[in-house]
Amino acid sequence: MFRGVATVSLDSKNRLVVPARYRDALLVNGAGRVVVTADPGQCLLLYPLPEWEPIEKKLTALSDFNPRTRSLKQLLVGYAHDIDMDSAGRVLLPPMLRKFAELDKNVVLVGQGSKVELWNEARWEAQVAQALSFSQEALPSELEGFTL
């Protein structure tokens, strides 16, 4: 289970040093084998391999006849990269994925249960500002009655 937010720096070889709390979960759930893919929100999604496999299976079963479904499948499955975390807990992010998410030196990791989102720092700050600007009237219907 991934939760919490952490900011980390890519090293000189564009490797992401996974924080210990996430690293331990990745080792337990997938032996350090991860899948990193693009998200429509222009961040990256990092899944332990066992968490990604059922998602990929569902995606590839979708019809290509619906253009929106096909586009989403192309994005999520097309950009997916299998990556092994090294013994120092680092993940080498492929150039195409770094470019997609506009990742530079600082990367924000956001735990989201079964996955971790990887954000460009400025884009993450904009995402937080947008989340804070919601009014009670603008909440999606699925959140009606939800309390913290």
From Swiss-Prot:
Q: Which CDD domains match?
A: MraZ_C (cd16321), MraZ_N (cd16320)
PROSITE patterns listed in its UniProt record: SPOVT_ABRB (PS51740)
State a single Pfam family of this protein.
MraZ
Its localization reads:
Cytoplasm, Nucleoid
Q: Which GO terms describe its biological process?
A: negative regulation of DNA-templated transcription initiation
Q: Which domain of life is it from?
A: Bacteria
The UniProt GO MF terms for this protein read:
DNA-binding transcription factor activity; transcription cis-regulatory region binding
Disulfide bonds listed in the record:
none
Q: Where is the SpoVT-AbrB domain?
A: 5-51, 80-123
Listed under subunit, the entry gives: Forms oligomers.
Name of the protein in its database record: Transcriptional regulator MraZ
Q: Which species is listed as the source? A: Thiobacillus denitrificans (strain ATCC 25259 / T1)
